[in-house]
Design a protein with these regions (language model features):
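Alpha-solenoid helical repeat scaffolds
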Residues: 1-209
Length: 211
């Protein structure tokens, strides 16, 4: 099948599994790299193979250098495959690498796919731990442009402004978030929105508006 169709993903994958299970590491690695560096290989197959690479690496002692090098090669071969970059970020967290390095990968994802909500949430949560309020405001403002119906980004935006003591901007963000409430909205988050709005209005002396 491989001779007839050199890009046959199923056939190449089966051959890779055969060599891998037989302990023929050299041939298995050649096939693995061939598939991972091909733009014709599906994102799902690449993710499965990279998870196997991570598993094998951890069982062999956990040296992250060759794994990260492989990730970089795969990303360079297809920069638009954000799934691989997200998996790299997850691996870096597994290896307890510095948050700033993980953040760099997530920023690369957002450069390619600015509407990737998962990458943006992960990045904001990372920055939150270091109280990087200005960066969070910037990321959240971008988020509501690309994901205007995602309430969590209005929450992040409002809370970051609130932490900066900019209550007017915080109130504006929370009000915009409330306008996105629907039947599927998280009830706890909705409650938080109204509670925070009430606190801000109370601080501003608008006790009527607070209730």
């Amino acid at each position: 099948a491989v001779d007839d169709d050199p890009d046959n993903e199923y056939a190449l994958g089966s051959l890779y599994d055969y060599y891998h299970d037989a302990g023929n590491d050299s041939l298995a690695q050649q096939l693995r790299d061939r598939m991972l560096l091909s733009t014709k290989t599906s994102a799902q197959t690449k993710a499965t193979m990279l998870r196997q690479v991570i598993k094998d690496s951890e069982q062999a002692g956990g040296d992250s250098i060759p794994v990260l090098s492989l990730f970089d090669k795969v990303i360079k071969a297809d920069p638009k495959d954000v799934d691989v970059a997200m998996l790299k970020a997850a691996y870096m967290e597994l290896k307890k690498m510095p948050a700033e390095q993980v953040d760099t990968v997530l920023l690369q994802v957002l450069h390619v796919a600015p509407d990737n909500a998962a990458a943006r949430v992960q990045l904001i949560q990372s920055l939150w731990k270091r109280q990087r309020w200005d960066d969070i405001v910037k990321l959240s403002k971008e988020a509501v442009q690309y994901n205007p119906d995602e309430m969590m980004f209005y929450y992040f935006l409002g809370m970051a402004h609130y932490q900066k003591n900019d209550n007017d901007a915080a109130l504006d963000a929370f009000r915009r978030g409330v306008s996105e409430i629907n039947d599927q909205s998280d009830h706890d988050m909705v409650s938080d929105f109204y509670g925070l709005m009430g606190d801000i209005l109370h601080q501003k002396g608008d006790n009527k508006g607070a209730y």
